[in-house]
């Protein structure tokens, strides 16, 4: 009624639909992505159960550990044959060494090696005791992404897709496991060299 007095002549249903869409858009904007200052945060995930074959037709099933610093977008990836907790710890230590530091917080998907009870809208996350102790020893705060909120881990999900796209052409092209590991290591270097070049060009 107030806006009618101010001269609005449109239908109420149109206005209601507009307000509804505006509210939805504002809600989406609130969870678009996680952005932080330098040294604050990183994201971790796995590219799970990739399958490739060497020149002789032998099958290799493996995982790619994914680590991305939020601000600089520096990345660390490495091939693993399993996703056990000890493997995760080793990958994290290697990532800290590669990036020359430990961020204040690291965002994780709700993987079993990290959480005993996932974070939900109504319940707080319960971290695995061994993992939580590791985080304290390494001096970072673990943060669990809420399920079905892909915006909070967009960097690692984009990286996972990119890694698969870059590795897939080598299917049936490499000789053995050693060369496969080297392919992933070379890609890790290439990812960061590419990122540095893009930043330099933008400046």
Task: Briefly describe each language-model feature range.
Residues 1-8:
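DNA-recognition alpha helix
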Residues 17-33, 166-170, 188, 192-194:
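Short, basic alpha-helical nucleic acid-contact segments in DNA-binding proteins
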Residues 11-15:
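Short coil turns linking two alpha-helices in DNA-binding domains
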Residues 19-75, 83-90:
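Mobile-element integrase/transposase regions
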Residues 102-123:
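Acidic/histidine-rich, metal-coordinating catalytic segments
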Residues 108-109, 121-122, 142-164, 176, ...:
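RNase H-like two-metal-ion nuclease catalytic core shared by retroviral integrases
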Residues 160-203:
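Active-site-proximal acidic segments at structured loop/helix or strand boundaries
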Residues 77-105, 124:
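Active-site beta-loop-alpha junctions of metal-dependent nucleic acid enzymes
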């Amino acid at each position: 009624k107030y806006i009618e007095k101010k001269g609005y002549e449109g239908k109420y249903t149109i206005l209601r639909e507009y307000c509804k869409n505006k509210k939805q858009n504002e809600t989406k904007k609130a969870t678009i992505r996680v952005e932080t200052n330098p040294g604050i945060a990183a994201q971790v995930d796995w590219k799970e159960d990739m399958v490739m074959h060497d020149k002789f037709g032998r099958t290799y099933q493996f995982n790619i550990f994914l680590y991305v610093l939020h601000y600089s977008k520096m990345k660390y990836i490495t091939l693993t044959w399993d996703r056990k907790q000890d493997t995760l710890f080793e990958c994290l230590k290697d990532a800290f060494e590669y990036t020359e530091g430990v961020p204040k917080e690291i965002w994780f998907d709700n993987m079993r090696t990290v959480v005993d009870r996932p974070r939900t809208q109504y319940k707080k996350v319960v971290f695995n005791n061994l993992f939580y102790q590791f985080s304290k020893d390494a001096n970072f705060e673990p943060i669990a992404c809420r399920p079905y909120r892909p915006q909070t881990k967009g960097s690692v999900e984009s990286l996972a897709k990119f890694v698969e796209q870059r590795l897939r052409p080598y299917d049936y092209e490499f000789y053995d496991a050693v060369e496969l590991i080297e392919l992933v290591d070379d890609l890790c270097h290439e990812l960061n060299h590419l990122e540095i070049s893009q930043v330099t060009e933008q400046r």
